[in-house]
Regions:
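Short glycine-enriched, charge-decorated loop/helix-capping segments at active-site entrances
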Residues: 6-13, 77-81, 151
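Residue-level signal for inorganic ion chemistry
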Residues: 20, 94, 108, 140
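Structural beta-sheet core signal
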Residues: 37, 63, 104, 136-137
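Short phosphate-binding loop-to-helix
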Residues: 55-101
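Short beta-strand-to-loop acidic/aromatic patch adjacent to the donor-nucleotide binding site
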Residues: 100-110
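Conserved core of the sugar-phosphate nucleotidyltransferase
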Residues: 113-185
Length: 185
């Protein structure tokens, strides 16, 4: 990666807090009561030592593993693939431990407490028999750019009622002399 390491484990706060620690703190303050971490198996020992151990006894936490060959029946991993499948696949890996309304984040992005409060409110107001109810907290792409290179983002469009209509993956997004630009594939 451009970063050159596992930024999920690198401390940046005054007491070594990670970006993930700030998100977990904000999520707990917003009313979330359980954490499910989805990681690669080869990352387990470091993750338990640096992250999971600090939450034991404070909030229920589960650990699931994402593997590129863990696929639904009828699917196979293309030969030579090394890169993880992504967020949807990670969520699939947690299907046996998530039985309640939930929120998904990436642990190397900072969201802020307001984001957790918004999604927490949505989830807490769902009727008990709710199925297939979804929401997302969106951010203006210009507020998510890096000063250290390009980023990839899902660019969302909505209808007049605020319903999500499309998500288009854009790569190599950056600011060029003011405006936000991306590579047109």
């Amino acid at each position: 990666s451009r970063y050159g390491g596992l930024k999920q484990l690198d401390g940046l706060g005054p007491n070594g807090e990670t970006i993930m620690d700030y998100s977990i703190f904000d999520a707990i303050k917003a009313g979330f009561g359980k954490i499910v971490f989805i990681i690669r198996k080869d990352f387990e020992n470091d993750f338990r030592e640096k992250i999971l151990n600090k939450y034991e006894g404070h909030i229920p936490a589960e650990l699931c593993f994402q593997s590129i060959d863990a696929l639904p029946e009828g699917f196979t991993c293309p030969e030579g693939r090394e890169k993880p499948w992504g967020t949807n696949h990670a969520v699939l890996m947690a299907k046996d431990v998530v039985n309640e309304p939930f929120c998904v984040i990436n642990c190397d992005d900072f969201y802020n407490r307001d984001a957790f409060q918004v999604i927490g409110k949505f989830l807490s107001e769902l009727p008990e028999d709710s199925k297939n109810a979804y929401a997302m907290v969106g951010f203006r792409v210009g507020n998510t750019l890096s000063e250290n290179g390009t980023v990839a983002r899902g660019i969302c469009s909505t209808d007049e009622a605020g319903n999500l209509t499309t998500v288009v993956e854009r790569t190599e997004i950056m600011r060029v002399n003011g405006p936000v630009c991306y590579k047109d594939e």
